[in-house]
Amino acid sequence: MRTVLALMIRNRKLFFKDKGMLFTSMITPVILIVLYATFLAKVFRDSFTAAIPDMITISDKLINGTVAAQLTASLMAVSCITVTFCVNLTMVQDKANGTRKDFNVSPVSRGKIYLGYFLSTVANSLMVNGLAFVLCLGYLFEMGWYMNAADVLWVLFDMILLVLFGSTLSSIISFPLTTQGQLSAVGTIVSAGYGFICGAYMPISNFGCLLYTSPSPRDAHESRMPSSA
């Protein structure tokens, strides 16, 4: 266990040493929440208000709070998955620069080596998505806060589960990759495709029947965000 911990610390130090990767990872949630609030808020609001019958009147605060919950759930669903591909770059870098050859001839099992990569990815991703979580709570507070302490803890628990899933997914996909270009290409595909699949870029009701009826990670977040009605 001490060996795994040492490998995890080593991988985390490499992540913080690469200022470009660290800055990109930290700024991504900020950019996402600005883009979501600027461009997607109106799309979600129009989709929500269009489904309300004319004889029913709902306050703007309730509508804004519901839309903000949808946007933050979408952001967390995307960020928890895509950020892990960025912070897991150390795994591929070690293969590209030949460091893995040194590990392979050392008296350390490959299982411990990969466990060190996985744990460092989880820790770094939790740090980045923790920032996104705080920003989302601030956005909810500004638009229409309605959650209690238990709701916040459940959403935090959902975030941890998604980070574990994203770290596992990125570790599996990154396993056969040997260059940074390959990981960048995979990360781009995952970022674009996953955002649409989980309904982050547009309301799922606008999709076809297959995606409309399939559960997504965003549903888990929304299920933890009760309606203020």
Task: Kindly label every feature range from the protein language model.
Residues 110, 118-194:
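Alpha-helical transmembrane segments and their short interhelical loops
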Residues 6, 10-14, 101-105:
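Short amphipathic alpha-helical coupling elements at transmembrane boundaries
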Residues 48-63:
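Perimembrane loop-to-helix junctions flanking transmembrane segments
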Residues 31, 64-139:
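Hydrophobic alpha-helical transmembrane segments of multi-pass membrane transport proteins
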Residues 10, 14-47, 67-85, 126-129, ...:
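Hydrophobic alpha-helical transmembrane segments of multi-pass membrane transport/permease proteins
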Residues 34-43, 174-211:
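Transmembrane helix segments
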Residues 212-220:
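Conserved small/polar residues in nucleotide/adenosyl-binding loops
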Residues 1-8, 211:
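Short, membrane-interfacial amphipathic segments enriched in basic
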